[in-house]
Amino acid sequence: METRWLHITSENFPALCDAAKGVCVIPMGCVEKHGLHLPLGTDILEASWITYEASKIEPFCVFPDFTFGDVPENYSELPAGSITLPVETEMLLLEQLCEQIARNGFKKIVIYNGHGGNNPWLTTFLRKVENKPHDYVVCVAMMPLVAPHKMAEIIDEQGKEAVPEMNEEDIALVK
């Protein structure tokens, strides 16, 4: 069964909601420079790919990508191609999207975050959502950058300084 929101017809939408048991996952990332060799969309491309692949194992609805992550730099100094919005705008947009997701029958919403810079405002967002009455719940899952057993192996072989190198690039290469 197709699990991606944008790829399903309106007629088949209720069946997706049933098959997903009311669970919808929002892949989240950002658009920013990732060194000289990775694409600007590395975070969101990885989160989106992982989310879709996981939905093939355990059915849930995959919402369209939320690409507007926080890039905490001076707007005038952002590298070419980077996109960032004020956190207040991101929070309002995400809250409205959650309302629409719930209106469509998905009462369990998971934000699968692929960008560490989103963590501070997502914590505030969750607190805000929890303090309002809703007929849905929202939680955040952060994309792990390195499998724990792999991290331990790297530390044993190369020292703890090598661990920061095992991150987005490795996931991009696996994909």
Predicted regions and their residues:
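Short catalytic helix/loop segments, enriched in acidic residues and glycine
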Residues: D43-S55
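Active-site histidine-anchored catalytic micro-motif
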Residues: T3-I8, G69-V174
